[in-house]
Amino acid sequence: MNTLVIVLIAAVCLLGAYTLYGRWLANKWGIDPTAKTPAVVHEDGRDYVPTNGWTVFAHQFSSIAGAGPVTGAIQAAAFGWLPVLLWVLLGGIFFGAVTDFGALYASVKNDGKSMGMLIEKYIGKTGRKLFLLFCWLFCGIVIAAFADMVAGTFNAFGADGALVEAAQTNGAAGMVSIMFMVFAVVLGLIQKKFNFSGWKESVISIVFIVLSFVIGANLPLILGKAAWSYITFVYIFFAAVLPMWLLKQPRDHMTTFMFVAMIAGAVVGLLVAHPTMNLPVFTGFTNEKLGTMFPILFVTVACGAVSGFHSLVSSGTSSKTVENEKDMLKVGYGAMILESLLAVLALCVAGAAAAADGTPAAGTPFQIFSRGVAGFFEMFGVPAYAATVFMTMCVSALALTSLDAVARIGRMSFQELFSVDDMEHAEGWRKLLCNVYFSTFITLVFGFILTKIGYANIWPLFGSANQLLSALVLSTLCVFLKVTGRSNKMLFPPLVIMLCVTFTALVQRLMAMVKAISNAAAVTIPAGETTWGAVFIANGLQLILAVLLIVLGLNIVFHSFSAYKKAEHNSEAKA
């Protein structure tokens, strides 16, 4: 099948869903353009900052569009491109976008409270503590994985200490990234001083993007992975503590232009070349490497269709910057729809890169996507070096923009975990733990330690944990909508399905870990404990975490169900 046809069908479905279903949700729940948002009421210059709607959209999209939509869609294509396409469209429209929009809506209607605080209000303090602990651990794992990914992308040296073939390109992309950070601060100061917005802000952003690429391409920074790792953690520390307007928002705004150029390059490339989708339509309900389609397809596609992490961004940062309630639809629902389109593009690029017999292209999903889109740019006359640097930067930016968002959310989760209502008279140790700088430091140290001791041993659980997070958010939204007298029945199908998906995936993973450990013990204990110990390190951490996730998830679901039964319809005045 022609990949262009697939993209056009997806684009029509997604745009139609935003226009019809998204607006229906907004009308059903109620949007008040005259209401004062938390950003206006609680403006503090750091987290609560009234911001132009499109700038908030840029922040939301760049923060949620991490590695997931590209890697997930391409990896899940092992089941065939049709199941992936169907889940991305159905999941994005009826699951992911609804969850993101709902989380943003609930937070804005509750003074910008994060999801943890919303859970305390509608489900209880125990549920809140459990959820915040889960969020903080989740953020630590994501920080470790994405920081390692970014450092690896910019790394110029191989294991033997010699320069790798792509050293020049990697170093250039790294320098571009640093210049992005520098110019983001300059852009933030300009916006603050002159109150620029709209086309003026966009023109300045584009100029800074061009300057960043010119400087980076001509002055590559050749460093090893360890050095880039330190630079990455220093950056995300400042991104987590500095005011949103000074670094995070302007960087997201600039990055979004780059993402739009990447998406446009992919779309135009598919339009001009209209390559054939070489991946098979459907390979079966079981895959030798991945397992059964249910639930693996759903947890593998992850962010391209639905992601619990998105709700943390919606309620953790975006809700505190929305200037007008009318912007919530494009920020919450629209950003997710665009991410689903990105997942479809990644699927089509991978399909075009596959061999005629259906054999997938060699390399990681990021490498496949990067090479494919860079090839499209070269088709339009862009020099190979420039195209490769651009795509390397885009790939790293997908991880970086999520990384600085999750660092900030992790910091907030840690603060909320130990905070009390009367912080002014709280104990000294509690004030220390809730300090912005200390909580950020602890969060990043946790992530940094995971990069050193092997986060890869627990990373396979990321997909399940992420989807469990979305189910927990949906359960909270059901209670919120009920007590405020709003319709919540559209949340029931995604809630039930996501609970089935996540708990099935976790139980399957748990059983696989038990089997791997017991098999290794049976084979190696008579001869020695070396092999068994290695297997336990690789699988034991997953086993322990899987059990914790199941217990934690069931506990929160139980509290949510209990709260829902006790909650009276329309018992709380509509915000």
Question: What are the functions of these language-model segments?
Answer:
Residues 101, 270-284, 334-372:
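Extracellular/periplasmic helix-exit of transmembrane alpha-helices
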Residues 125-140, 334-340, 387, 416-452:
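Loop-to-transmembrane helix boundary motifs in multi-pass membrane proteins
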Residues 16-30, 134, 171-215, 225-272, ...:
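Membrane-interface loop-to-helix entry segments
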Residues 2-19, 76-107, 116, 174-184, ...:
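Extracellular loop-to-transmembrane helix junctions
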Residues 16-70, 256, 292, 296:
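Membrane-interface "cap" regions at the ends of multi-pass membrane proteins
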Residues 23-49, 72-75, 85, 89, ...:
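Flexible loop linkers connecting adjacent transmembrane helices
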